[in-house]
Amino acid sequence: RFIIDDTDVENHRLSLFAVRSLLDPVRLAIPSLTRDQRRLDVRPPRDCWVRVENDRQRRYIRRGLNQNNGSTQRDCFILRRDGTIEGDIDWDYDTVTRVEARPMDERPLVLKGGVFTTTANRMKQTKGYNYWARNIAIHRSNTTVVGLTHHVVGETDTGHPYGGFLAVSSCANVTLRDCFVTGHKTYTTLG
């Protein structure tokens, strides 16, 4: 059993636990991509989770309340050792300005069990949001989480949103099986 008290926290942006690969990222040169492309002339030393970006193109621009300038165009996929692409490329990339390639661990990792109870934050802020981490961050491919339970207690009318207790990013083939996570209260600050 783990008790997480978020009523008085020094740094709410940090994860409590991190599951990471011990493999170092690799450098790949990918000058361009086309939508639905299925192969690259690149041969990584092992299968990799890859994210490509074109910072000259913006997507998902929001207008009106909470407007923003959108996000850099990006796609992620699995690049196999033989250069085949697994996953769909959604956009055309006349140029790729950034490539992130993370080798995928071949041996599966299984995390079993655990009951976590979070006493929710009560952070006050008049404008905008500060998303809280205070979670388990998974950045390792071929990982399975089985039988984890997360409860939230002590929510009030004041507080900030969480980014998710199980936060999976920059990896592939992650399975969450027989897990239970309590939803958090919704707060309505705009701006």
What role is predicted for each listed range?
Residues 1-191:
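Extracellular/periplasmic carbohydrate-active domains that bind, remodel
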